[in-house]
């Protein structure tokens, strides 16, 4: 494998690692968003339950305080993950550009090498054709003379 091929392989590996990191961040953010939705639903459910009993009415304010604190922490975590996700997306874009740069260089190198070999082959065939033509002329002149 050429040096450019190795660079493509290494940078592709790095790109895949960055994509996996990004996917992990996106999954975690989605989980936190689902947790937030679940918390909101639980809050509504507890609010409905609290109106039906005295014990619920007494315990509900403590539950609300804890739920609001949890919601605040979830929102902060989601915001931080959104920032980290955007940074990871930028890293993936940059890594992708690197891979494309090295793939293009590798492809150009391979094309130039194929062209060089094709030119060498054409020259060899031209030389062979010229030699055969000269031999044919010599044999014709010997047979005529």
Language model features: what each stretch is:
Residues 1-145:
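Charge-rich amphipathic alpha-helical interaction elements
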């Amino acid at each position: 494998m050429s040096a450019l091929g190795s660079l493509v392989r290494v940078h592709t590996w790095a790109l895949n690692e960055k994509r996996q990191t990004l996917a992990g961040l996106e999954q975690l953010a989605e989980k936190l968003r689902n947790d937030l939705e679940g918390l909101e639903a639980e809050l509504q459910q507890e609010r409905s339950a609290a109106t039906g009993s005295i014990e619920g009415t007494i315990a509900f304010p403590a539950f609300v305080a804890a739920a609001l604190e949890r919601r605040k922490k979830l929102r902060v975590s989601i915001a931080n993950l959104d920032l980290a996700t955007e940074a990871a997306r930028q890293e993936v874009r940059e890594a992708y550009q690197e891979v494309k740069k090295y793939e293009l260089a590798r492809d150009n190198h391979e094309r130039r090498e194929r062209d060089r070999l094709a030119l060498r082959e054409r020259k060899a065939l031209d030389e062979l054709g010229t030699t055969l033509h000269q031999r044919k002329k010599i044999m014709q002149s010997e047979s005529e003379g």
